[in-house]
From Swiss-Prot:
Active site: C150
Highest taxon in the source lineage: Eukaryota
UniProt cross-references to SMART domains, sorted A to Z: Gp_dh_N (SM00846)
Residue positions where Phosphoserine is found in the record: S120, S146, S149, S239, S310, S331
Gene: GAPDH
Entry protein name: Glyceraldehyde-3-phosphate dehydrogenase
Binding site for NAD(+): R11, I12, D33, R78, S120, N314
Location of this chain's protein in the cell: Cytoplasm, Cytosol; Cytoplasm, Cytoskeleton; Nucleus
Modified residues (Deamidated asparagine): N7, N62, N68, N147, N153, N223, N314
Regions that span the bilayer: none
GO terms for cellular component: cytoplasm; cytosol; GAIT complex; microtubule cytoskeleton; nucleus
Notes on activation and inhibition: Glyceraldehyde-3-phosphate dehydrogenase activity is inhibited by fumarate, via the formation of S-(2-succinyl)cysteine residues.
Pfam families noted in UniProt: Gp_dh_C, Gp_dh_N
Amino acid sequence: MVKVGVNGFGRIGRLVTRAAFNSGKVDIVAINDPFIDLNYMVYMFQYDSTHGKFHGTVKAENGKLVINGKSISIFQERDPANIKWGDAGAEYVVESTGVFTTMEKAGAHLKGGAKRVIISAPSADAPMFVMGVNHEKYDNSLKIVSNASCTTNCLAPLAKVIHDNFGIVEGLMTTVHAITATQKTVDGPSGKLWRDGRGAAQNIIPASTGAAKAVGKVIPELNGKLTGMAFRVPTPNVSVVDLTCRLEKAAKYDDIKKVVKQASEGPLKGILGYTEDQVVSCDFNSDTHSSTFDAGAGIALNDHFVKLISWYDNEFGYSNRVVDLMVYMASKE
């Protein structure tokens, strides 16, 4: 089992740790966060407003974080190059601060003895992998990889199934996206993106997202064929993708439902879900899929032009894929 260090104990860092303990697929051996001391880590890991209390034991003991009886080394370094991952036995590092997202910056972890780095965010220059879509293109010459974004992880599996079966001529995506930590509780300054600084709980906020264009990086045949935007809405978690696309081959909406259902039960099982239930966003809280196709919500204008809807827990689904990507990488060592 691969030994993992986590840099940044925020939403994704904590939930990757939860996903690791829930699944038992990887071994968390170290956590670094300069802003959260050990006792605070215990509290933050145990209690979660969105996903509920951790089902297990968590305590501080002898300067370590102990989860379900397993001791985890704690570091509080600001500079990633100073974290002694090797001493803690961490082979892979999950870079989840949101700050060190380039090859150069994330590469600092290798100086402390880590063998590989998984960036839990899109990266300008690191190769991006989406489980179920292009993870098989990974090869172990790569030291630093990106798990792309939560939205790309939702959109790409659906786009792959549609493109493989009917061909996507072009498409536009909108994600109706839950609040994240980068937003403001009340109106405040926000650099160049003025709208992003408006109160998150009070507004529907149009925002940019690179998620659709990023699909072109993980599915090269779709490069230049998709783009998209986001609406940030006042919900704490769970988002939904609306993919509106023109199809090469004519398809009835029932044909689309059929191929997505088949994929969800076959090659994309556990990654792409399928439901015909009358669901709403809360129904996907703590769901581990990257994407769940909502068969009842989509519409077709004609046999070549459709709007497809897919839900995702933007925190927990994504965190589970980070774990799955590490498991896959470890299988190639």
